[in-house]
A protein has these predicted regions:
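N-terminal secretory signal peptides and thylakoid transit peptides that target proteins
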Residues: 4-22
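Conserved N-terminal structural module of periplasmic/extracytoplasmic solute-binding proteins
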Residues: 7-9, 23, 30-149, 158, ...
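Hinge/lid segment of periplasmic solute-binding proteins
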Residues: 63-66, 139-198, 255, 262, ...
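Extracytoplasmic/periplasmic substrate-recognition and gating elements
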Residues: 67-73, 96, 100-105, 209, ...
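Long, aromatic- and glycine/proline-rich binding clefts that accommodate carbohydrate-like moieties
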Residues: 73, 168-172, 178-180, 350-354, ...
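Helix-loop-helix "hinge/cap" segment bordering the ligand-binding cleft or interdomain interface
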Residues: 96, 100-101, 157-160, 180-254, ...
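Ligand-binding pocket segment of bilobal, Venus flytrap-like solute-binding proteins
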Residues: 142-143, 234, 281-344, 390-407
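Short, solvent-exposed loop/beta-turn-alpha elements that line the ligand-binding surface or hinge
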Residues: 154-174, 215-218, 242, 263-287, ...
Length: 491
């Protein structure tokens, strides 16, 4: 991973307010959390078939060096808008300005994550009803790549500017060796990094408990984590010193997955590199899951609803002083801005990189990506080629420096474009510095897989819950997770 000059980022920051109707390049980051928004779609049929034909748009002059896509209508399914209300407004403005500037029309399906990981998208793809371009977490694209609906990056790499691609080259080993290794190389292009496993904590709770934030935050290892959490709970003003996360959609990925990866490297993944075996029952996983469960069951540092606790609850409960420390995912950043206000601005609540348990890795990220799709079976090749070019022009917007410089505020993600990192603002809450340190130290990442959702969520989730509630031991949970994964994969 690339290095950088580690600068202290302690200055106060302005919480940017929503600017309704602002232009893309001037839009401020709206605050607030977003769930899966109700899907909405403009006129036109699915992009995979005959729908979304060209024509009907007023021709405009393209900027120098751009492809002329005026009059082209293409299908775009967009999921990233649910990161926050600010992200939704930002992206709607982005699309509107793209259409105005190019004369193309993006036939939008504004949707959320549920349809991607559930049955809706895959059923539509199988019925030849799919877009020309979509956004999603890279690890959720395996079913669509495996069905040969996604165009690999190498097939259109030459159509992206060299100077743009150069800022994303640092991610290519992660795609080639981990994410898309199953298909021989990178299939999609990342534009945003959703950070998993960072710490957030109340610095005033540390001080009231007699702890030193400069040396006790973040905790150095698992033993130190338990020690700090215990001190916060027994001597600080909060009710719970270290809140665990295990709610639906968050089961094991926020914790303890980043800890397993940091402890065991590739042994902390859920599959071997060649996908010939599941790893949930190895020593790394059993040790980490046991330590995770012990934080709640043995040390009592997490609240009574831990078995169902979601990380979206953290900002409000941390603002109220109920919990002192936890591991919220980075998209909670806009919610912290909205719900915490001055305590966030002045550094009372701060972020830090996640646990380093020996490998140097301090958490991981989900890359949010843009994917280009192949033509539908009934789509005219000439029409498809124009729609494909329009889709690539839209991808360029997501990868552009102007857009990348705004993602941290509007969506709580680290921009994937490397050259904008050093210009991220100094903040007292330290979010951007923490996320950057995590990205720079990332060594291994989960493989994309057609059955990723089952392997990462559906199989482990029930067993991690039973381990938290004490119905089964952590070791038994690991054994059952591995057994079910092997059965699913036919191993």
């Amino acid at each position: 991973m690339p290095g950088s000059d580690r600068r202290g980022r302690l200055s106060r920051r302005r919480v940017i307010q929503t600017t309704a109707g602002a232009s893309l390049l001037g839009i401020a980051g709206c605050t607030g959390g977003g769930g899966d928004s109700t899907p909405t779609q403009t006129s036109g049929d699915g992009g995979g078939g005959d729908g979304g034909g060209d024509g009907g748009a007023t021709k405009t002059t393209t900027q120098a060096g751009e492809v002329d896509i005026s009059g082209v209508t293409f299908e775009f399914w967009e999921t990233f808008n649910v990161q926050s209300r600010g992200a939704e407004e930002f992206l709607r403005t982005l699309v509107s300005e793209f259409e105005e500037r190019t004369g193309a029309t993006a036939n939008m399906n504004w949707t959320g994550y549920g349809p991607v990981i559930g049955a809706e998208w895959i059923n539509r793809f199988k019925n030849d009803d799919y877009p020309h371009v979509f956004t999603a977490a890279s690890q959720w694209t395996g079913r669509f790549i495996d069905g040969d609906w996604v165009v690999p990056l190498d097939e259109y790499r030459d159509e992206l500017p060299d100077e743009m691609l150069a800022q994303y080259e640092w991610t290519e080993p992660l795609y080639n060796d981990y994410i898309d290794q199953m298909w021989g190389g990178q299939q999609t292009v990342p534009f945003a990094l959703q950070m998993i496993g960072p710490f957030a904590a109340r610095m005033d709770h540390f001080e009231e408990a007699g702890l030193d934030p400069s040396s006790d935050f973040p905790p150095e290892d698992m033993e130190h984590l338990v020690e700090v959490g215990t001190t916060l709970q027994e001597q600080g003003p909060g009710e719970y010193g270290m809140q665990l996360i295990n709610g639906g959609g968050d089961q094991i990925d926020a914790q303890p997955v980043p800890w397993a990866m940091s402890k065991g490297g590739e042994e902390g993944l859920f599959l071997t590199q060649d996908r010939s075996d599941a790893l949930y029952d190895n020593d790394t996983w059993k040790e980490i899951l046991s330590q995770w469960v012990a934080i709640y069951r043995e040390h009592g540092l997490s609240g009574p609803n831990t078995s169902q606790y979601q990380d979206e609850q953290i900002p409000a409960q941390m603002a109220a002083g109920r919990i002192s420390m936890s591991n919220p995912e980075s998209p909670n950043h806009p919610t912290f801005q909205e719900q915490v206000g001055e305590m966030y601005e002045n550094g009372t609540i701060q972020w830090a990189p996640g646990l380093d348990l020996g490998t140097g890795q301090k958490g991981y990220f989900f890359p949010q990506c843009v994917a280009i799709c192949r033509p539908g079976p009934n789509e005219n090749q000439r029409d498809y080629e124009r729609r494909r070019k329009a889709s690539i022009e839209m991808m360029k917007v997501f990868l552009s420096e102007d857009v990348q410089r705004q993602l941290h505020e509007v969506a709580g993600v680290l921009p994937a474009r490397r050259d904008v990192w050093d210009d991220l603002p100094d903040t007292a809450h330290n979010a951007y510095d923490a996320w950057q340190e995590m990205a720079e130290n990332l060594q291994v990442l989960h493989h994309n897989h057609p059955q990723y959702v089952e392997l990462m969520y559906n199989i482990p989730g029930p067993y991690s819950t039973q381990a938290i509630t004490g119905d089964i031991s952590p070791e038994e949970a690991c054994d059952r997770m591995a057994r079910d994964a092997r059965e699913l994969l036919g191993l």
